[in-house]
Regions:
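A polyanion-binding, active-site-adjacent surface
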Residues: 7-10, 15, 22-261, 269-273
């Protein structure tokens, strides 16, 4: 192989990685010399009304999402759901972790590589940091419920699209309605966009409580946005702000009797460990 051809192959590989491809799907290369099949020109699609920036448009989804009477039925409904293309590229469904009757629900973005391989949310480096963050205010996976907005890993760990979020959002709403938590913690911009919407980003919203309407619940839930642990790994200076958010979560839970003070150990600054 010449230097020029090797450089061309590396450039093509880098482009595929940028697009989100992270594995080869064909065992044999296609015959590019063969005549291409004739394709019928597609009819132009009708233009859709633009949505407001930062707003996720809800799409029609499987009725089993709203009809699930238990978490087991909800998981089965997700396993049977084929409208989200991410299911075809992911290794498996990453459903949830933690207590099924938790009073605090942690909502992340989407599974990464480790989560896709193991089948549990937040098990990679970001998950290890999340465990440390929860432990700093006396919580752990046995006292919270952990779930992602999108339960399948996007190729290349890219950010889920608004369409993918909208396809999975009814299942997230049903998950919340079945667990019936008292408080939500929204980790990162995707969770905020899915449940709060609007134009404001996570930097502006973090640390302030918002009310979120959930289908299937007769009351709004208070939700606290904060930084995603993966972001904190890339930007360690933001850990101080996340620590302030955790202290606010602890204060709210104790003062609102969501959790008794005895259920939450003394706070220990996770940024110093």
């Amino acid at each position: 192989m010449t230097g020029d051809s090797r450089a061309a192959l590396l450039a093509a590989l880098a482009l595929q990685a940028e697009w989100g491809a992270d594995e080869a799907l064909l065992e044999t290369p296609p015959d590019r010399a063969a005549a291409p099949a004739q394709r019928r020109p597609a009819s132009p699609a009708a233009p859709s009304a633009p949505s407001a920036p930062g707003t996720v448009v809800r799409l029609p989804t499987a009725p089993s999402a709203l009809g699930a009477a238990s978490l087991a039925e909800l998981r089965a409904a997700l396993e049977a759901f084929d409208q989200c293309a991410l299911k075809r590229t992911a290794t498996q469904l990453v459903f949830a972790d933690g207590a099924e009757d938790a009073r605090i629900m942690i909502i992340g973005e989407a599974p990464g590589g480790e989560e896709d391989r193991i089948g549990r949310p937040f098990v990679g480096p970001a998950g290890q940091l999340l465990d440390k963050m929860l432990g700093s205010i006396g919580l752990d996976r046995g006292t919270v419920r952990i779930v992602n907005v999108v339960p399948w890993r996007p190729p290349g760990n890219r950010t889920p699209s608004d369409t993918e979020i909208a396809q999975c959002l009814p299942f997230l709403h049903r998950h919340i309605a079945l667990v019936r938590p008292e408080r939500l913690v929204l980790l990162g911009a995707v969770a905020v966009r899915a449940l709060i919407g609007g134009k404001d980003g996570i930097t502006r919203l973090r640390g302030t409580w918002r009310e979120v309407a959930i289908e299937g619940l007769d009351r709004k839930l208070r939700a606290l946005p904060t930084y995603h642990p993966a972001y904190l790994l890339r930007q360690p200076a933001a850990k101080r702000l996340a620590w302030a958010d955790l202290l606010e979560l602890r204060r709210e839970c104790v003062e609102s009797c969501v959790l008794r003070n005895s259920e939450m150990r003394d706070s220990q600054d996770f940024t110093k460990s």
